Structure formats: structure tokens, C-alpha cells
């Protein structure tokens, strides 16, 4: 205890002496030599305050955006059964160019503008028209002797949109935009054709946990035939998905379509879809099952009710996938279940034989039952300028849903690969063979045809 007290006393005395020395130093002005000793010259000055960064401006967002550039060159040939009018095969050499700019984000806003141009290269040996239309081809009456290849020359504003993302769960998009819903069975951009389908619309997307939803009001449909065949629209699209597990996803949808200049395609379609995937040993198994009902809307057509059933199962092992699929689109003898806004090229065969006058979408007055089998192989073969190869073979068997009549069959084959990270090449083939005979009272199926495509595509 005495030792601790002694130490405390010594510390206190030292502190007092230090204080006294400091006071004396303050009371007696030092001479210059003393000042030099007592004011060290190596004391660092305080750093200047860090300037506050200026808030980003709209100009910064525009300048910090990214260039959009796509070029797709394609050769397409069509050999269709000849008639008194259709006497020649069709060929088209076309080049599609898209050029645009997407801004960086500014206060949750992001803008995009894109132009699209489609040009023919060489002779115009093809017709542009709605299949089955009785009017002359849009590219000239003299082209009626050729099969239809719907890639008209066009230069247009493809997209002009503003997207606002107030938080991670919400996004709103207004303007001319691309709308792809699910597998594009009911709403898509028809991306296979050179002039894609876009929508003048206001759209809201919600993503909250396992729940996602999309709503869009569509004012105008910019279709694949240029402005001559666009649709004025007063349509509503609603799709909602709940995903409790990877093996099960439930989706509900309502598509209320009202087209001022296409009453035949005005309809309301609602339905449910279940899908999912899981592992069974070394195999991944995926499935889809869809039911929808379609009826007249706003009294634009006589009353009707038509059903759609669709389902598929895909098994994947290593680089191989096998899929079995069945679709049934009901027909009542006057009209069939239709999907006016779908990317229809992906369904009922790549030959597009069942694209009918009803708006140019795939349909058939007696309905279509389509049983198809697919084999997909993704070879591991890789070279510097050849990789990501993909080979797909598919077989379709078509019957009329209402009568059961044989409509025909089709083989589809596609091989594609990447040449660089931005350049790809694809070769595609479709052959539809119509049934040899039609039972009495059954609708006549479309004529036989064979199509070949060779495509180079560059995407920045």
C-alpha cells in the first residue's frame, strides 16, 4: 500500500513540475533560437478536406451507357407445292441491322432507343403477305408466283422505352418495347423473323420472394410485316407465377386482346400452367403442363369457347436431351384456338405450314393435335473459331382435333455454333408433308413445303 502511495505521489509531483514548466514557457517569450527548438519544423499540416463528389447528371447517364448493335444476314429458300398461281420457288437474301443506345441508370431511371433496318440483297424472289390472304402481295402483285417469305424491307423505330426501378422488387417500363412472357407461347417478339414484333405499352414487373407478376397495357402492336399490318390495341396482359420449389412452379395468366383493326383476333384467353424440374439419379427431368380457355371478347366476333391443352417431359443426361410433347388446340369447324401475339414459329413446326389468314398466327379451323418428339445434342467439340455447338432434331405428327383426320407430318433439323463470342452461324431445315387424302367433311390441310435457312448473326 505504501509503495502504491509513493508511486502516486511521485506521478503527481512530476505532473505539477510539467505544468509549471509549461506555464513559465508561456509567460516568457522565447528568442528566435529557442523558438526554433521548441517549434519543430517537421510537424505535418492538416490535409485539405476531400471534395464532395458531384451528383451524377442525366448527361452522365447518357454518356455512361452502352451501344446496342446487331447484324443478322440470312438466306432462306422455300419449295412449296405448285398451283396455277404459285409457280416458282422462293429465295430471299436479307440483312437486318439494329442500332441503338441504352443509358446508364440515373435516379432509378434507364432509357433505351433502338432502330431497325431490313434490306434485301439481290433479286426479290419471294412474296410478303399474310398467308392465305386473297389480296396481292404487299411487295407487288407480280410476286404472287412466289411462296411467302415474310421479311419485308423496313426501316423503323424498333424500341424507345424508359424504365424506372424504384426498388429491387418493382420495375415500370413505358414506351415501345419488347415483351416476352414465359416461353412465348402466348406473348412474344417473333424473334425468328427479321422484323421483330414490339409493343407500344406500359408494363409493370413485380418480384417479391417466390412470387413474380407482369402486367402490361398494350396500345399498339408493331407486327412483323411493317406498319402496313400493325394492330391498334386496347389489350391487357397479366401473368403471375408462384415458385415454392424448383420441382414445382404454378403460373396463372389472362390475356384480354382487343384489336381495333383485327376483330377476328380479338379474344380473351385465361389459363394455368404447372412446371418444374428435378433430378432422378443421373437424369434431370423437366415438365410443363398447361390448360387455357379462349372465348370471344367485347362482342367483336360471334360467341365461341375453345380449349388448349399442352404438356411436355424432357429428360437430360450429360450432353443429350430427349423431349416428348403434346399440344391440342381446339377447333369448332369455323375457327380454331389462336395465339395472335405468340412467337408461333417455335410451335407446330418450323415450316409454319399452319400459319393461317387469321392474323397470320398458327391456327386451323378443325383444331390441331400435335404430337412431337425431339432430340437435342450439345457436342463438346471445341476449336478456336467453333464452339458451343447445338444440334436439334424434331418430328411432328399432326391430326385435326375436331375430326381426328390426319393432317401431315414434319421433320425439323437445326445445327448452330458460335464462331466468336459475338458471331454465330446456324443452318436450319423444315419439311412438312401434307396427308395424302382428306376424309369427307374435314378441312383441307395446308400444302406440303420444304424450307432451308442459313444465318450469320453478330451481337455486340
Give each language-model segment a name.
Residues 2-106, 318-321, 325-326, 460:
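N-terminal periplasmic/intermembrane-space "pro-region" immediately following the signal or transit peptide
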Residues 28-32, 36-37, 168-172, 186, ...:
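Signature for the C-terminal beta-barrel architecture of outer-membrane proteins
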Residues 57-59, 81-89, 101, 147-150, ...:
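Outer-membrane beta-barrel proteins
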Residues 74-78, 118-122, 179-181, 218-222, ...:
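Structural signature of outer-membrane beta-barrel domains
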Residues 76-95, 105-160, 166-168, 179-193, ...:
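Surface-exposed loop and membrane-interface regions of Gram-negative outer-membrane beta-barrel proteins
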Residues 339-366:
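Flexible internal linker/loop segments at domain or repeat junctions
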Residues 360-369, 374-420, 425-429, 433-435:
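Flexible, acidic glycine-rich loops studded with aromatic residues
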Residues 373, 447-460:
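Outer-membrane beta-barrel "beta-signal"
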Amino acid at each position: 500500500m505504501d509503495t502504491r502511495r509513493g508511486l502516486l505521489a511521485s506521478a503527481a509531483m512530476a505532473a505539477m513540475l510539467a505544468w509549471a514548466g509549461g506555464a513559465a514557457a508561456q509567460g516568457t517569450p522565447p528568442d528566435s533560437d529557442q523558438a526554433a527548438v521548441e517549434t519543430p519544423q517537421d510537424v505535418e499540416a492538416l490535409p485539405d478536406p476531400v471534395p464532395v463528389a458531384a451528383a451524377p447528371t442525366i448527361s452522365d447517364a447518357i454518356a455512361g451507357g452502352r451501344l446496342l448493335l446487331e447484324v443478322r444476314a440470312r438466306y432462306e429458300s422455300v419449295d412449296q407445292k405448285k398451283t396455277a398461281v404459285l409457280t416458282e420457288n422462293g429465295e430471299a437474301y436479307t440483312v437486318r441491322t439494329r442500332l441503338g443506345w441504352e443509358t446508364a441508370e440515373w435516379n432509378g431511371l434507364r432509357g433505351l432507343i433502338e432502330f431497325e433496318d431490313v434490306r434485301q440483297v439481290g433479286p426479290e424472289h419471294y412474296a410478303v403477305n399474310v398467308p392465305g390472304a386473297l389480296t396481292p402481295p404487299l411487295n407487288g402483285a407480280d410476286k404472287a408466283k412466289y411462296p411467302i417469305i415474310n421479311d419485308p424491307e423496313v426501316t423503323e423505330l424498333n424500341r424507345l422505352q424508359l424504365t424506372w426501378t424504384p426498388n429491387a422488387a418493382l420495375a415500370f417500363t413505358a414506351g415501345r418495347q419488347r415483351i416476352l412472357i414465359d416461353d412465348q407461347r402466348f406473348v412474344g417478339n417473333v424473334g425468328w423473323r427479321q422484323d421483330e414484333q414490339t409493343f407500344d405499352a406500359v408494363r409493370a414487373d413485380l418480384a417479391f420472394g417466390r412470387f413474380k407478376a407482369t402486367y402490361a397495357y398494350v396500345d399498339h402492336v408493331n407486327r412483323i410485316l411493317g406498319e402496313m399490318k400493325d394492330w391498334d390495341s386496347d389489350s391487357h396482359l397479366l401473368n403471375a407465377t408462384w415458385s415454392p420449389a424448383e420441382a414445382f412452379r404454378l403460373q396463372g395468366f389472362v390475356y384480354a386482346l382487343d384489336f381495333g383493326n383485327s376483330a377476328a383476333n380479338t379474344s380473351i384467353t385465361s389459363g394455368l400452367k404447372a412446371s418444374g424440374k428435378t433430378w432422378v439419379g443421373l437424369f434431370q427431368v423437366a415438365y410443363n403442363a398447361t390448360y387455357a380457355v379462349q372465348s370471344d371478347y367485347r362482342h367483336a366476333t360471334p360467341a365461341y369457347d375453345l380449349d388448349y391443352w399442352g404438356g411436355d417431359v424432357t429428360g437430360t443426361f450429360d450432353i443429350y436431351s430427349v423431349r416428348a410433347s403434346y399440344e391440342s388446340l381446339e377447333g369448332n369447324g369455323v375457327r380454331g384456338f389462336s395465339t395472335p401475339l405468340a412467337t408461333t414459329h417455335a410451335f407446330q413446326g418450323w415450316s409454319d405450314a399452319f400459319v393461317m389468314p387469321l392474323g397470320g398466327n398458327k391456327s386451323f379451323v378443325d383444331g390441331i393435335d400435335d404430337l412431337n418428339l425431339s432430340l437435342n445434342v450439345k457436342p463438346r467439340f471445341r476449336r478456336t473459331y467453333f464452339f458451343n455447338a447445338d444440334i436439334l432434331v424434331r418430328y411432328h405428327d399432326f391430326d385435326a382435333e375436331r375430326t381426328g383426320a390426319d393432317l401431315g407430318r414434319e421433320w425439323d433439323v437445326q445445327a448452330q455454333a458460335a464462331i466468336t463470342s459475338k458471331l454465330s452461324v446456324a443452318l436450319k431445315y423444315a419439311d412438312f408433308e401434307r396427308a395424302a387424302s382428306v376424309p369427307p367433311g374435314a378441312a383441307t390441310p395446308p400444302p406440303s413445303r420444304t424450307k432451308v435457312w442459313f444465318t450469320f448473326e453478330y451481337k455486340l
